[in-house]
Design a protein with these regions (language model features):
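Short glycine-rich anion-binding loops that position phosphate/pyrophosphate groups of nucleotides
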Residues: 26-27, 95-98, 122-124, 240-241
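Short acidic-hydrophobic, aromatic-tinged amphipathic segments that line or gate anion-handling sites
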Residues: 69-78, 132-136
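Acidic-glycine-rich active-site phosphate/pyrophosphate-binding loop
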Residues: 8-15, 111-126
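Short glycine/serine/threonine-rich phosphate/pyrophosphate-binding segments
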Residues: 29-35, 98-102
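Short, conserved loop/helix-junction motifs that constitute active-site signature segments
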Residues: 83-85, 107-114
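Short alpha-helices
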Residues: 119-188
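Glycine-rich phosphate-binding loops that contact phosphosugars or nucleotide phosphates
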Residues: 89-105, 117, 124
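Hydrophobic helix-and-loop "lid/oligomerization" segment in the mid-to-C-terminal part
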Residues: 2-25, 33-35, 39-65, 69, ...
Length: 342
């Protein structure tokens, strides 16, 4: 976001406004942390903010301050539509294009007459009236911190804002272990802790609250793990039947793909999850070094994200998707073999 846009937005938000804050479909820790962090900040500034998420988010994020005040577009449609239609501006957080909210909500947003403000760290964003896009940032939550800073309001940080932003940074950096984590990230984290983010409690709420069913599902996933050493690749599959047998709920597959990436010598990991409701195979990719799963997902699986973490989908069956994936591994063999951690 350039200085001119900051000044324009500061002027626009100088008086109380009705603001809607939107995260992407299937919200993760960064999306929920960013939307709720911005919600608390705008509320302290005297605005009337409303968070609208497209659908359900994981149970391990329900503790976040303000989460009970969010609207779900999929089953609180009338309230969501009313908030959107009455708003003076809509903030789009942690996604780069309107289709990332799902078809129904996208149709509503495309009819919106006022301005959008985008804050996001994914590649190739669409154009909106106000843009704060930085693909070098580890998370949208860190960008919300810097946005508050740019607005001259860093002194307004409190425990609610700090806890939300800490959560998103922690989850999107794999607990600060990914290459996107910088010294600046740690400085931001330190400031959030100084302003009330209880790091031990947040970590426990997110990572130490697994249901028995989730652990059983993890066991099933690890049992399905396949390693292809000739391609430095590992992948996991989960069918709808396997999910149902282990009492699957949204969020149970979060982070499982990282187990495949943790195998010694692996530079590309994937998880393929059957979703009968959407009639697709949902895919998460992770990589090490120079192999860009963002380009790979964009080109072959109608997805994208970051160079070392991205998502995609397939309209083929599980078996057909795996055949396609393995054929692509052969096509990308040289790149995979020579990928390295720089």
């Amino acid at each position: 976001m350039i200085l001119k846009q900051i000044k324009e937005l500061k002027t626009f938000l100088y008086t109380p406004k009705r603001v809607v804050i939107v995260g992407h479909r299937n919200p993760d820790g960064d999306a929920m942390g960013a939307t709720l962090g911005l919600f608390h900040y705008l509320k302290k500034k005297g605005h009337q903010p409303t968070v609208v998420v497209p659908n359900e988010y994981p149970k391990f994020l329900h503790w976040l301050p303000g989460s009970k005040k969010t609207f779900r577009f999929d089953w609180q449609n009338s309230q969501s539509q009313k908030a959107i239609n009455k708003s003076d501006i809509i903030f789009l957080l942690d996604f780069n294009a309107l289709h990332r909210v799902g078809h129904d909500m996208q149709s509503t947003l495309e009819k919106y007459q006022n301005d959008f403000a985008l804050i996001d760290h994914h590649q190739e964003p669409d154009e909106f009236a106000y843009m704060y896009s930085d693909t070098e940032m580890c998370s949208t939550c860190q960008m919300i911190y810097h946005f508050i800073e740019k607005m001259g309001d860093i002194h307004l940080l409190d425990s609610d804002i700090a806890s939300c932003l800490y959560t998103g940074i922690m989850t999107d950096t794999g607990s600060f272990r990914f290459r996107s984590t910088t010294s600046l990230t740690h400085k931001v984290i330190a400031h959030l802790i100084d302003n009330g983010a209880e790091n031990h409690r947040i970590h426990s709420n997110v990572y130490d609250s697994s249901s028995f069913g989730r652990l059983q599902l993890l066991g099933q996933a690890l049992n399905n793990l396949k390693v292809l050493p000739e391609y430095k690749t590992a992948y996991i599959t989960l069918t709808e039947d396997e999910k149902e047998a282990n009492n699957f709920v949204k969020g149970d597959t979060e982070g499982i793909v990282n187990y495949a990436l943790s195998v010694e010598g692996v530079v590309l990991a994937a998880i393929f999850i059957e979703d009968k409701e959407q009639q697709i195979i949902k895919i998460s990719f992770r990589s090490k070094g120079t192999f860009s799963v963002n380009k790979f997902a964009r080109k072959h699986f109608n997805g994208g994200g970051h160079d070392n973490a991205s998502g995609g989908k397939s309209d083929l069956s599980m078996d057909e998707t795996l055949i396609k994936f393995c054929d692509l591994l052969e096509d990308n063999k040289e790149q995979l073999i020579h990928s390295y951690d720089s």
